[in-house]
């Protein structure tokens, strides 16, 4: 993270020792080991900061992502994707920050639409995407799951996958990386993280890339 953005989080004047420690760790250790593309790194960090509710750090990272040329649509898609995994109550501050900063950078809102489904096909297309990423077992869950699970399973296909995973703006590999960082940063979601680790491997994010994503998130989530 560049000096001016780090200083928005930690005052070099008031807390010079912590500033130096964090700056050294980020620049000499974490960034030096970076295996991700610029876009991947920023999307991973932004997603982790949403997951851990790191509002001040998110704003600083967002400034840096915009200056580094990350596509605003990709940033917006990461924020929208977070709605499925964090819930509306936790993503609103980040949505508002992203909108405000994009306008600061001269962008006109709303950005071009990226949705590909409608009321009639969101369930079917979402279920197809689920099966594509996680296997035929996802289809069986719609008919064979215990009755109390049926609503949640249907919503998972229609909303999480039909409304979000089918969108343009991020490819499957980027979207799975974003999702894993959102889950990782919340803590206590190991079962979900295992499932999405398999999902990442299935879309071509190999073990080295997943380790790289965790490394870039680590300074922000511990």
Regions of interest found by a model, annotated:
Residues 45-56, 188:
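Alpha-helical bundle segments that constitute or directly flank the non-heme di-iron/ferroxidase center
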Residues 77, 83-89:
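Substrate/cofactor-recognition hotspot
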Residues 70-74:
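Winged helix-turn-helix DNA-binding recognition segment
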Residues 1-39, 51-52, 56-63, 67, ...:
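Acidic, glycine/proline-rich low-complexity segments that act as flexible tails and inter-domain linkers
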Residues 40-49, 78-79, 175-184, 213-217:
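Short, structured motif recognition centered on aromatic/hydrophobic residues
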Residues 171-208:
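Glycine/small-residue-rich hydrophobic helix-like segments
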């Amino acid at each position: 993270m560049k000096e001016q953005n780090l200083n928005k989080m930690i005052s070099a004047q008031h807390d010079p020792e912590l500033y130096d420690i964090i700056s050294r760790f980020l620049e000499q250790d974490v960034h030096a080991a970076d295996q991700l593309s610029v876009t991947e790194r920023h999307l991973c960090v932004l997603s982790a900061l949403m997951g851990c509710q790191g509002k001040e750090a998110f704003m600083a990272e967002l400034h840096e992502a915009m200056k580094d040329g990350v596509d605003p649509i990709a940033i917006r898609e990461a924020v929208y994707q977070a709605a499925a995994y964090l819930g509306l109550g936790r993503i609103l501050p980040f949505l508002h920050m992203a909108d405000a900063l994009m306008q600061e950078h001269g962008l006109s809102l709303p950005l071009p639409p990226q949705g590909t489904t409608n009321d009639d096909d969101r369930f079917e297309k979402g279920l197809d995407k689920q099966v594509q990423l996680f296997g035929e077992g996802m289809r069986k869950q719609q008919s064979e799951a215990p009755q109390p699970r049926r609503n949640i399973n249907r919503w998972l296909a229609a909303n999480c996958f039909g409304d979000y995973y089918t969108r343009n703006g991020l490819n499957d590999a980027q979207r799975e990386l974003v999702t894993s960082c959102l889950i990782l940063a919340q803590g206590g979601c190991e079962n979900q993280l295992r499932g999405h680790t398999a999902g990442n491997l299935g879309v071509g994010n190999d073990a080295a890339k997943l380790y790289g994503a965790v490394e870039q998130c680590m300074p922000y989530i511990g």
